[in-house]
Regions:
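N-terminal beta-strand motif that seeds the catalytic metal site of vicinal oxygen chelate
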Residues: 1-29, 59, 75-77, 129-134
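Core segments of cupin and vicinal oxygen chelate
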Residues: 16, 22-60, 66
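Active-site beta-strand termini and strand-to-loop segments that position acidic
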Residues: 53-57, 118-121, 131
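Vicinal oxygen chelate
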Residues: 28, 77-125
Protein backbone atom coordinates (compact mmCIF):
# COMPACT_ATOMS: atom_id res chain seq x y z
CA UNK A 1 0.00 0.00 0.00
CA UNK A 2 1.29 3.45 -0.90
CA UNK A 3 0.98 6.48 1.36
CA UNK A 4 0.90 9.96 -0.17
CA UNK A 5 1.68 12.62 2.41
CA UNK A 6 0.67 16.27 2.26
CA UNK A 7 3.29 19.00 2.38
CA UNK A 8 2.82 19.45 6.12
CA UNK A 9 3.13 15.70 6.74
CA UNK A 10 0.17 15.66 9.15
CA UNK A 11 -2.46 14.09 6.88
CA UNK A 12 -2.07 11.06 4.66
CA UNK A 13 -4.07 9.39 1.94
CA UNK A 14 -3.82 5.62 1.64
CA UNK A 15 -3.98 4.39 -1.93
CA UNK A 16 -4.76 0.70 -1.81
CA UNK A 17 -5.39 -0.31 -5.43
CA UNK A 18 -5.92 0.88 -8.96
CA UNK A 19 -9.63 1.54 -9.45
CA UNK A 20 -9.99 2.62 -13.07
CA UNK A 21 -8.03 3.15 -16.27
CA UNK A 22 -9.33 5.65 -18.80
CA UNK A 23 -8.63 5.41 -22.53
CA UNK A 24 -9.73 8.19 -24.89
CA UNK A 25 -11.21 6.88 -28.15
CA UNK A 26 -12.55 8.55 -31.29
CA UNK A 27 -15.29 6.01 -32.14
CA UNK A 28 -16.91 4.86 -28.91
CA UNK A 29 -19.35 2.43 -30.54
CA UNK A 30 -16.65 0.62 -32.54
CA UNK A 31 -14.29 0.47 -29.58
CA UNK A 32 -17.03 -0.82 -27.25
CA UNK A 33 -17.74 -3.58 -29.76
CA UNK A 34 -14.01 -4.45 -30.00
CA UNK A 35 -13.39 -4.68 -26.25
CA UNK A 36 -16.69 -6.48 -25.54
CA UNK A 37 -17.02 -8.80 -28.54
CA UNK A 38 -13.47 -9.38 -29.80
CA UNK A 39 -11.54 -9.32 -26.53
CA UNK A 40 -14.39 -10.65 -24.39
CA UNK A 41 -13.94 -8.03 -21.65
CA UNK A 42 -17.06 -7.99 -19.44
CA UNK A 43 -19.17 -4.90 -20.22
CA UNK A 44 -20.46 -3.09 -17.13
CA UNK A 45 -22.47 -0.08 -18.30
CA UNK A 46 -22.55 2.94 -20.61
CA UNK A 47 -23.03 6.63 -19.89
CA UNK A 48 -23.13 9.50 -22.39
CA UNK A 49 -19.77 9.44 -24.19
CA UNK A 50 -18.40 6.56 -22.09
CA UNK A 51 -18.37 2.75 -21.82
CA UNK A 52 -17.19 0.84 -18.75
CA UNK A 53 -15.74 -2.67 -18.50
CA UNK A 54 -14.47 -4.91 -15.69
CA UNK A 55 -10.85 -6.03 -15.90
CA UNK A 56 -10.73 -8.32 -12.87
CA UNK A 57 -11.87 -5.66 -10.43
CA UNK A 58 -10.22 -2.71 -12.19
CA UNK A 59 -12.65 -0.68 -14.24
CA UNK A 60 -11.73 0.27 -17.82
CA UNK A 61 -13.40 3.44 -19.08
CA UNK A 62 -13.47 4.14 -22.80
CA UNK A 63 -14.46 7.75 -23.40
CA UNK A 64 -14.70 10.32 -26.11
CA UNK A 65 -11.94 12.92 -25.65
CA UNK A 66 -12.60 16.19 -23.88
CA UNK A 67 -13.66 19.07 -26.11
CA UNK A 68 -10.67 20.51 -27.95
CA UNK A 69 -8.49 17.44 -27.54
CA UNK A 70 -8.06 14.22 -29.45
CA UNK A 71 -7.61 10.58 -28.59
CA UNK A 72 -3.96 9.80 -27.82
CA UNK A 73 -2.19 6.46 -28.07
CA UNK A 74 0.20 6.69 -25.12
CA UNK A 75 -0.94 4.15 -22.53
CA UNK A 76 -0.54 0.39 -22.78
CA UNK A 77 -3.10 -1.91 -21.19
CA UNK A 78 -1.46 -5.13 -20.00
CA UNK A 79 -4.07 -7.89 -19.77
CA UNK A 80 -2.99 -10.67 -17.40
CA UNK A 81 -3.94 -14.15 -18.63
CA UNK A 82 -3.16 -17.57 -17.11
CA UNK A 83 -2.16 -19.18 -20.45
CA UNK A 84 -0.70 -16.71 -22.93
CA UNK A 85 -0.43 -19.20 -25.80
CA UNK A 86 -4.10 -20.18 -25.50
CA UNK A 87 -5.24 -16.56 -25.11
CA UNK A 88 -3.16 -15.50 -28.13
CA UNK A 89 -4.60 -18.31 -30.27
CA UNK A 90 -8.17 -17.49 -29.19
CA UNK A 91 -7.81 -13.78 -30.00
CA UNK A 92 -6.13 -14.49 -33.35
CA UNK A 93 -9.11 -16.77 -34.06
CA UNK A 94 -11.40 -13.79 -33.37
CA UNK A 95 -9.52 -11.67 -35.89
CA UNK A 96 -7.30 -9.69 -33.50
CA UNK A 97 -4.01 -8.90 -35.31
CA UNK A 98 -0.86 -9.17 -33.16
CA UNK A 99 2.48 -7.40 -33.68
CA UNK A 100 4.25 -10.71 -33.05
CA UNK A 101 3.98 -13.97 -31.17
CA UNK A 102 4.07 -14.40 -27.38
CA UNK A 103 7.64 -14.18 -26.12
CA UNK A 104 9.59 -14.00 -22.87
CA UNK A 105 10.59 -10.46 -21.90
CA UNK A 106 12.14 -11.24 -18.50
CA UNK A 107 13.46 -14.29 -16.66
CA UNK A 108 13.40 -14.50 -12.87
CA UNK A 109 14.03 -17.36 -10.43
CA UNK A 110 11.39 -20.00 -11.13
CA UNK A 111 9.69 -18.28 -14.02
CA UNK A 112 9.49 -15.94 -16.97
CA UNK A 113 7.31 -12.97 -17.85
CA UNK A 114 5.78 -13.44 -21.30
CA UNK A 115 4.03 -10.81 -23.44
CA UNK A 116 2.32 -10.47 -26.81
CA UNK A 117 1.44 -7.03 -28.20
CA UNK A 118 -1.47 -5.93 -30.37
CA UNK A 119 -3.47 -2.80 -31.15
CA UNK A 120 -7.14 -2.04 -30.98
CA UNK A 121 -8.87 -0.60 -34.08
CA UNK A 122 -7.81 2.97 -33.14
CA UNK A 123 -4.14 2.10 -32.66
CA UNK A 124 -4.06 1.91 -28.85
CA UNK A 125 -1.39 -0.57 -27.75
CA UNK A 126 -2.45 -3.54 -25.64
CA UNK A 127 -0.56 -6.60 -24.48
CA UNK A 128 -1.29 -10.01 -23.11
CA UNK A 129 0.97 -10.85 -20.19
CA UNK A 130 1.53 -14.04 -18.24
CA UNK A 131 3.92 -15.31 -15.60
CA UNK A 132 5.13 -18.71 -16.82
CA UNK A 133 6.72 -21.13 -14.36
CA UNK A 134 9.92 -22.80 -15.58
Amino acid sequence: MTTLETGAGTDSVKISKLGQIGVAVADLEAMTTFYRDHLGVPFLFAAPGMSFFDLGGVRLMLSLPERGSEARHASILYLDVPDIAAAHAALVGRGVPFDGVPHAVHRYPGGELWMAFFRDPEGNMLALMSDVKV
